[in-house]
Amino acid sequence: MLLEGAIVYSNLIALLSLGLTITYITTSVPNFAHGTIAVFGSYLALILLYFLNIHPYIAIPIVFLLCGLIGILCYSLVLRPLIKRGASVVILMIATLALDLILLGFIGSLSDAIEEITSKSAKKFIFAIYDFEISGISGILFVSTASMISILVLLWFLLFKTKFGIALRASMENPALAEVMGIDVEKTRIFSWFLSSSLAGLAGTLLPFKQEIVPLTGSLIIVSIFSASIVGGLASIAGAIFGGYLIGISESLATYGLSMIFGSEILLYSKVIPLTALVIVLLLMPQGIVEGLRKWIKFFSI
């Protein structure tokens, strides 16, 4: 049960850190609204369940697309105008914080409206009762793992087997040179925000099967998302995935171990664990684990 929960949580953190890294690589903006976009996806799944009786697993493609559209709106209406005006990274970062607060306020109002209309709980909810089991193993383990594998396969195919993917990679590695070569860098940025927010929506739909969701959940989980991305190397897609699993598993296992020693009150401080892992990794490998391992391997092979 513990290992099952750790794997599920790691799958979701890996999906979220992957999305965060994609937008950082293409626009150099750390998106502080990423966690709240995921929770918005959770609430979209809840709306589809309450009003249209669509099971959350069936709702995945719908939420995926809707959250992707939210990402396009965030970039097109807020970030692109600022980038065109030559805004610094700090200003863009503050803009994502503002987006986070706007989304958070909207989610709070949305949860009030859902409760008033349906008389069902929306301020706090969980999807565990809608899950299935196979041989005593929760369905969320299979679904989250299958989702992660599917995303990795599709992303690999997109980046390495399509013309648009090659253009996207070129824009990620050197936007100025890509633009000189005639690549529409703006289009790749819009797509990256769509993809990033879609991944957040996917993770957000699955998250209520793992834990209770409240409007502020995104503000808590963003700590783990950023820790995973930075630990792996903020500009590395492979690092984001590796960091997601490292942070997810260590946070789950360490929280469980500490709760056995100090009691359940320690759960209030669970986010100290990913932050501690982040500090340790940055002290040993400032550029992230993936780049750090490459340097160590190169050093010992001399």
Question: Model features per residue range: what roles?
Answer:
Residues 1-16, 44, 57-59, 85-90, ...:
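Membrane-interfacial amphipathic/re-entrant helices at transmembrane-helix boundaries
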Residues 1-50, 77-87, 91, 229-237:
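Single transmembrane alpha-helix segments in multi-pass membrane proteins
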Residues 26-30, 69-117, 161-163, 219-234, ...:
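Short loop segments and helix-boundary regions at transmembrane helix junctions
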Residues 133-214, 218, 237-243:
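Helix-loop-helix "hairpin" substructures at the membrane interface of multi-pass membrane proteins
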Residues 173-180, 184-187, 258-302:
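Cytosolic-side transmembrane-helix boundaries in multi-pass membrane proteins
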